[in-house]
Structure formats: structure tokens, C-alpha cells
Amino acid sequence: MPINKKIKKVLVIGSGPIIIGQAAEFDYSGTQACKALKEEGLEVVLVNSNPATIMTDTDIADQVYLEPLTFDYITRIIEKEKPDGLLPTLGGQTGLNLAVELAEKGVLDKFGVTLLGTNLEAIQKAEDRNLFRELLDDIGEPFIESKIVDNLKEAVQTAQQIGFPVIVRPAYTLGGSGGGIAENVEELKEIVTLGLKRSRINQVLIEKSLYGWKELEYEVIRDGNDNCITICNMENIDPVGIHTGDSIVVAPSQTLSDKEYHLLRMASIKIIKALGIEGGCNIQFALDPEGLDYYVIEVNPRVSRSSALASKATGYPIAQVSAKIALGLRLDEIKNIVTGKTYACFEPALDYVVTKIPRWPFDKFSKGDRSLGTQMKATGEVMAIGRNFTESFLKAIESLDIRLPDFMEDLDRESLENRVKKAYDDRMFYILQAFYNGVKPEDLYEWTGIDPFYLYKIEEIVRLSLKISSNKDKILKGEVNLLARAKKLGLSDSMLGRLLGIPDFEVRDLRLKYGIKPTYKMVDTCAAEFAAETPYYYSTYEEEDEVEVSDNRKVLVVGSGPIRIGQGIEFDYCSVHAVRALQDRNVEAIIVNNNPETVSTDFDTSDKLYFEPLTTEYVLNVAEREGITDVILQFGGQTAINLAEPLSEAGMNVLGTGLKSINLTEDRKQFNQVLTSEKIPTPPGYTVFSIEEALKLSHKIGYPVLVRPSYVLGGRGMEIVSNEAELKTYLTDAVKITPEHPVLIDRYIPGREIEVDAISDGNDVLIPGIMEHVERAGVHSGDSMAIYPARNLTTKQTRRLVNYTKKICNLFGIKGIINIQFVLDRDGQFYVLEVNPRASRTVPILSKVTGIPMVKWSVRIMLGETLNQITTLKGLVPPGDLISVKVPVFSFDKLLGVDIHLNPEMKSTGEVLGTAENLEQAIYKGLKAADFDLPEGGKVLFSLADRDKQEALGVVCRFIEEGYQVLATRKTALYFQKRGLRVEKTEDPVGLIKKGDIKMVVNTPTRGKEPGRIGFKLRRIAVEHNIPCFTSLDTVEMVLQALVRVGEEEKKEVIPLSEYKKGGVLV
């Protein structure tokens, strides 16, 4: 079928910032789609608010807009660009909802824009719970007993008719947002109230709970000629009742009979055909574990998180094929670019097993609600491939980059039963513990509902582990059969080291001595029936190896692993650009990573991809097989940097900044000595190894002090403590201080934080830009709003900052990228807070707003070039004409029990960028892009700590002057009233928020982070009711500026990336 010749320009809407439920998978799918459209000769216009994405690079689309993903802004872009078509299904739920809104409100008709691929009616039928149920009824497919409601009274009546427990599912939401399982009327009222607010059409489905049934997913694709194939079927190990994004998922399914498999496959094809979806589609089923009864749970009429997993699991490029189908091509006309020979109409075949395990943020939020249900809580996921389930399962656990719990603890049977009956993020580890304690698989099936197949396989891991522990001496003396069996089962060197009581590297030496080495197999979509042109490998312990090794110069790039707080998509952006930079210099680029959501693990990003855990063992195995000595770690976040020492000790050459310099930045004593010797101020600080030493040195420094563990990312475990009692609590509860795990203690210096990213070749230094944080020191840089260019530095201060940066680069022998964080105190004195000898999360932002390809130039330096050979630019690059504001984005609504108060520990999951000709407009855009519902009037509630009340006087006055009605809690109101301000006291702030009377909350915490305190309750209730809540007066001042100084016309202005005038570089 020929492509529609009327379509010459296509608009693609991205998914926006990384949030729980919508992560990097849409950068991957959007990038693939844009490339597919350009291959067909179409002009592509892309709009996305997330600057940390590959898809917002200027070479991905012909025109790129970093603008808020709202109806008004997209309408303005359509008006300006006049696209012929809109691709609605590759930007996640955000992109889909916007496309529907644009169609329903007549914008697409007005400007002559055609929805490509799946049409409006099909989207509405899949997303509207009522229409979808009617369709299933028409085609004879079973659906769960349920009813659509749009009010609380009807919800209660429906639940009582169906019988508790019930599941609540809001329409047009992502990640199960606003949904949940209700056991009683009280829980139902709470969930439905939030669900109705989250739904775009104020509609929720109340359905009978099938908790405990098997959950299966089918990824299906259909073209406009009604050709349809299934790409992959996936089985959730966790039964129905846990969101699939929080479930451990296996592909292909392991426990279905042939009859069950084909029953659900035919149902999937029947449903996608009835809906008329053109492109990829995900269909979820509940299957009775005792028979052939099944129900359709839901359909995603778009590329989804599961699509990304299915793509990486099979090698089938779902997003690329979906984009071509949207243009009118048939499956039998689209080449499979993995094999280069077959066509997209061939169903993939798998001769291996894939396991996905979610990555949760509870290492950051230990007090958050860790229970799992229908609302997703994971920030990211890992994927592993093996020849059997246990191998892929254990490799996935190894990929999580978490400290594995110690087993063989003395837990009684009742405690274990309680820990596994209800699903928590760590349930699988307690299942392992139960097997260590002798619990039978049959009992665990009764407790968990997990299919016995998986339980027996997990028991096999424990049985072998116990055997290895009891035969330790024999193994160390050369009895290697058990060792070889353990490697085939999937046990890593580190797991074996713990069982044998020896270091990892000794396990490695032992197995290499006896020739126990991995082989590598290829993922090719066709189980080796055809040769693949895009090498994509995984390790296993078998005889035949499928890797073809070249004699080219090659470099290994270590990726950043799963998306998590503190290490997000920004590092994948850097890894992808590192690969491209190597390829530009004719160096073979080989990447190791384990995140199925990302562009770095796409089939055609690198010369070779190894889908492996990011540990010393697996990285060295790849390096040894490929004959690689050079490795780049600067772009994989802290995960990669932590490998510098073991890889160097194993003989690998870490390109760029050396191991000595990396260690120097983390050793606080040496770090301070080096900077002090060059008269560069640092806050007084020490590395301490015991509680006694910490108390003594904190007293010497003087409170408040900033405390944190060494070698962490995202400020994990970082706090400001004000006295000795708080310090003792921190050292006993938050971290475990030992000689092996010291704690850093610095004096806390109040002031403004300034952030510098620089490129150095060891002699010359280039500073693309300086960013200034809005919130004062004490809020993690990832959680701060940040302005480029810095606006409050004098010429003299800027010169001093540049001078310090150059000195630091030279002192630490920086080759490549460096990130330095300064604080400017009230007396105008700079202090160096932190030096990161690696890429930071601001690299993508500065690269885009300055036009300087920071990663590319850094890689060239690592390969031996100097800055002089690369560019004529030196020192600080002059800023362009525009102002950009980075605004962090949080997922607090998904994480119950987590305090939203900002502090030195990072909490945001993503960020957006607002760019404009003036600061207020840039702030306004950034806040809109971050999905803040900014009130232009109404009631604003203040509840402030005593220390902040005087400072807040000016802000409160301005809110009143602008016509807002200011309310306050009792003590705060009394303070303002005494000073003559028109502030109304409220005794029931929580009730007012719940009723929807309050439009904004300003709450600065006192000493309390405890859930019982009123401040904590205020913050949580505001978040759960989608009301803007700010915990910093600095932020509130900026918000107020944006609200009162930006005119209606300014609010609608859009600027493509190509029109950014950048420091002498026009991109």
C-alpha cells in the first residue's frame, strides 16, 4: 500500500518528563518513530518538554520544540508549523491524551491535520471503559463484572452490588494513577475521590477483584490491511492485583499450556481487529490458574512500557514498524531491519528466556508505603536474558544495583508468611529466605498465588546455594562441577563469593583456572533461522559462541542501568552520544547496559550491544571476549564510576579522568587538602569512621552540619542535622557507619548554589555555561529549579568562578567532563561543595541551550585530542539571548507516605525546561511543563516554620496585592495578623484542601518529618489532591513572578530549538 502522498509533514508528541508510570521507554519509541518517518522522506516536527532525551536532539527531527505538553502550546505549534499529520500513539499516555483533546476540540479539523495510524474512534473505544466493555460484549470476549461511575455515591452502590474487594481503574491515566484495590467502603471512598480527579473524563471503573489469577500480556501489531501478528507474550510472575509495571515479568510465558497460549493469542488478534488499531497494541488478560476461564483486563492502544520490553526481548522494532504502518505501509512491505532479510510480518521466535524486574525507589524513601497494588511505584526496570528462567532471573537481580539482603536469618514461619502474603517490593527476597528456612513450594503457593513452576525454580536456586556452602572446601580445592552448574543456573561471582566466603575476584580466578567461561548468544528475532545484521548479545554458559570479533580499535561504554531517582535518563543520553562520538572517529563502539526502556539498548545505536548486568564480572567478561582494554565510565552515572577501581585493577584502561583523581574527589580529607593548598575554599569537613568520631568532629566544625555516606548518587542518605541528638539518630537509623562505609561531615553553609559543567583536556578548560539554583543551599541540585545563564553573579564573581574551575580541572587531571557545585555565601565568598569527575544530569540541558556537543567533545579528548584541535572556544562561553529554567518533576502522588519536603536527598524523577526571552516567561513555561496547575486567583494557604515567617512577609503581601485570598494555620495567621496583613485563620486546613477550596499550599517544615505531624499531613494531602505545594520560599517567589508578570500572549509563545541563539553558535 503506497504512503499517502498528501502527508508531507508529521507532528510527533513526546511523553514529557520521567515520572513513575512513564519513563525512558517513550524516548526510545519516539526516537525510533522519528527516524522511521524521516526514512520515508517526511518532514518531522517534534514537541517534548524533556531536555534529557535523545528525541529532542536536532538531528532526530527537522524541527524540535522544547515546550510544555499542554493543549494551548501544542495548538500554537500546529498553527505555526501546519503539519499534515499527527502520530498519536508513540508519546505514552500524555501524547495520546493530547491527541484526543486536540481532535475532540476541533483543532485538528481546523488546521487540516490527520490522525495517523490508529484513529480517534479506536482510541476512544480502548480508553473509555464503557465503550471498551461494549466492544468486548459485541465480539463475545469476556470482561470482568464492573460498572463505570462518575460519582462517589454510585461507586459505593456498585461496589456493594459486586462485593468487596473491588478494583478501581480511572480512565485515561497512566501507571494505574488514582486506582487501587478497595477492601471496604472507607477505602473505596478514598480511592474513588482521587481516581475521579486523575481521570481526564472524570470516570472510573469499579470491577470485581480477580486477585490471585494469572496475569498475561500480549504485544500485538496490526496494519491497515487487517494483517495482524503477535510479537511476544509475557507472563507476570506476580498474580493479578499488582500493576504490571511493578510485577516481575517473564517472556515468553513459562506456565501456559499450548491450548492456553493459543486461546489468548486468538483473543488478542480478535480484539485488535475489532478496535481497528493500526500499529502496536498491548492487551492484558487475567487467566484462572485452575482452568481455561479468562477475562480481558485492559488494552493500551499505543506503544507502551510493555512494548519497549517486548521489543528488547524479541529484537522486533515495534515503534519503528508502528510508525511505518501509520503512514500506510503493510507489514509485508516493511523490512525487518534486525535481519535485513525478513519482513515485519514474521512473528518473532525466542530460544531464550527474558526476565524483567522493576527498580523501586525505596532505598531513597525508607518510610514510604512499600506495598504493591494496582498503582505503579517503580521508577524503572532491568531486563536480563538467559537460556533458562533461573539464569535470566538471577542476572536480573544482579542488574538491580542494590545491596542484596543476607539470607539464613532466623525468621520464624509466621513472620515469613506475613512478609510474603502481602506484596511488597522485597517479597522475592523473603521467598528466597523462606526456602532457606525449609518452607515448601506448596505453602508459598498458598501464601502468594505465584505459579508453582516459578517457586520450584527458585527453590532449585536455594538448594544449590546450600549445597555450595556445605561443599565449600571441595570447591576451593578444585571440585568444579558444582561451580559450573551454579554458573549455568545463573549465580554470579559475587553471589558465589558470599556462599564460599571469598572475594568476587577469587571466584573469577577459580572459574577461569578451570576454563569456566561464558559464551555469547545473539538476539535476532528469529531463533537463528536467519543471520542478524545488528549484533545484540547476552551471556550464558554453553558450548557454542556466536560473537564475531573484529580487529578494529574498539572502546567499551558502560551504561547507567535502570532509571532511578538520582540516575535517570540524562545518563542514557550521555551514553548514546558517547557511542556516536566513538563511531564518528571510526572507533568500534560496544555498549553494556541492562535497561530495556532506553535508546542506548536499541538495536542500531551501537556497533555491538551486550545486555548484561553492570558489574565487574559481566563487564570484564565482555571486555575479555572482545579483546577490549579501553573503557569509558564517565557517562554511566555513579554505577559506572563505581567500577573504575575493580576494572583498573583487572588491567583495563579507564579513558579520561584517572582512578586516582576519581578517588581524590571522594576522599574528603585529601580533597580538602588539595583545594586548600591552592586557596580554593571548601566547607570544613571530615570523613569519619565511627559514631564517636562523628560527634567529636561535628562539635569542632559547628552545627548545622551536612552528613552523607561516601560514594553515593542522588544525595542518597544526605541530611542537614542541627544538633547532636539529630546526628545520633541519623548515624543509627539512616546509615550504618563502619570503617568500610565512612560518612562525610561538612559544615552547612547557607547561600545560593551555583553549578558548573566543564570540559577539560588536562590543560585547557571550556565552560559551556553556569547555572544558578533558585532554592538556597540545602536542596539537592536535582530537585532545585535552575536558571541558565546565572543571573545574580557580578563580573568579578564570574571571573573568580571560572578561575576556580580551571584550577580544579588542572589539580585533578580532568580529561573529559566535570561537574562542580559551589555555594555563594552571604558575604560573597564561594565554597566548593562537590566535584563530580563525570557527566552530570545537567549535561543534556547545557548541550541543548548552548549548542555545544559536550559529550562528543569530551570523548574526542578521551581519545587523545586537545581542545585546541576541536574548537576555538575557551573559558566561559558567552550566553545567548534566551533564558532557560530547569524545573524538577516529582512522582509523589504515586508514593504514599513519602514526605515531599525538599532537602539534600534527591526526590525528583525527572525534569523539564522552559525557555523564553525573559525570566518570568521561562519560569511560567517550566512550571506549566512540570504540570503545575498555577492558580491565577483563589485561596492560598500558608503554614510556616517560625524561622521563615519574617522572610515570608513580602511574599504574603504580594499575594494579597494581586488579589489572592491568603489563609494560614493558627500560629502563622497570628504572626501575619499582628503585622497588619489581611490573613484569615483556618482551624481545618486539611478539610479545606480535601473540599478543593485551596488552590496552592506554602508549607515550610519545622523539625518534623513524621507522618503524624500537621505539616506532613498538609503536604501529603495537597499532593494527593493535585494541588501545588511548595516547601521553599525561594520557589514561591519565582512562582509569583511568573503568575503576575507574564501576559496572555507571552504565555503562548513557542520557540523551536533551531532558533536558539547560542553563545556564538547557532544550531
UniProtKB/Swiss-Prot annotation:
User: Which Pfam families does the record associate with it?
Assistant: CPSase_L_D2, CPSase_L_D3, MGS
UniProt region (Oligomerization domain), positions on chain:
402-547
What PROSITE patterns would the database entry show? ATP_GRASP, CPSASE_1, CPSASE_2, MGS
Quote the record's binding site residues for Mg(2+) 3.
Answer: 821, 834
Residues binding Mn(2+) 2 are: 298, 300
Protein residues bound to Mn(2+) 3? 821, 834
Instruction: Give every ATP-grasp domain span.
Output: 133-327, 672-863
Xref: InterPro entries: ATP-grasp, CarbamoylP_synth_lsu, CarbamoylP_synth_lsu_oligo, CarbamoylP_synth_lsu_oligo_sf, CbamoylP_synth_lsu-like_ATP-bd, CbamoylP_synth_lsu_CPSase_dom, MGS-like_dom, MGS-like_dom_sf
Gene3D superfamilies under this entry? 3.40.50.20, ATP-grasp fold, B domain, Carbamoyl-phosphate synthetase, large subunit oligomerisation domain, Methylglyoxal synthase-like domain
| Keywords, ordered alphabetically | Amino-acid biosynthesis, Arginine biosynthesis, ATP-binding, Ligase, Magnesium, Manganese, Metal-binding, Nucleotide-binding, Pyrimidine biosynthesis, Repeat
Q: Where is this region: Carboxyphosphate synthetic domain?
A: 1-401
Q: Where does Mg(2+) 4 bind?
A: 834, 836
Where are the annotated segments for Allosteric domain?
932-1067
Ligase among the record's keywords?
A: yes
- Per the record, what about its domains? The large subunit is composed of 2 ATP-grasp domains that are involved in binding the 2 ATP molecules needed for carbamoyl phosphate synthesis. The N-terminal ATP-grasp domain (referred to as the carboxyphosphate synthetic component) catalyzes the ATP-dependent phosphorylation of hydrogencarbonate to carboxyphosphate and the subsequent nucleophilic attack by ammonia to form a carbamate intermediate.
- What's the stated role of this polypeptide? Large subunit of the glutamine-dependent carbamoyl phosphate synthetase (CPSase). CPSase catalyzes the formation of carbamoyl phosphate from the ammonia moiety of glutamine, carbonate, and phosphate donated by ATP, constituting the first step of 2 biosynthetic pathways, one leading to arginine and/or urea and the other to pyrimidine nucleotides.
* Family per record: Belongs to the CarB family.
Protein name per its UniProtKB record: Carbamoyl phosphate synthase large chain
